[in-house]
Amino acid sequence: FEAAPANTNFVTLDQNGTVATIANGAGLAMATVDAVAAGGLTPANFLDIGGGANEESVLKAFNEIMRYENVRAIVINIFAGITRCDEVAKAIIAAKKQIPALPPLCIRLAGTNVDEAEKLLDAERIPLLPDLEACTQKAKEYIQ
């Protein structure tokens, strides 16, 4: 694997994992990985995009995840403070357009500019889920 995108913490957990994770902040990223595992799924990675992530850095994170051949769902868990939900939403939209083989996304966004993010994603028919538990359940549905 190449180096992880700047300002991110990327750790491979299982090359054969079926669920990739993206979160901001180490604690939230660990909670996301734990929730995926507690749901009976195998997390492929730990990916903390850090504070202040923008469209470019999030798009690079998606490209890094695409190196995992067995990933069949991506759980995205963002609590925005410095990072803005609308920037993450723009990256998600760009990734869906630029990466044809992108696995299904299970997205939870909260915090700064979440209303704007919801409008952007809704316009592209990309659903948001209310919480991490719903994301894990949706990932399980995609995999089964």
Feature names for model-found ranges:
Residues F1-I76, L109-Q144:
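ATP-dependent carboxylate/acyl-activation modules
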Residues N70-G111:
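C-terminal hydrophobic structural anchor segments
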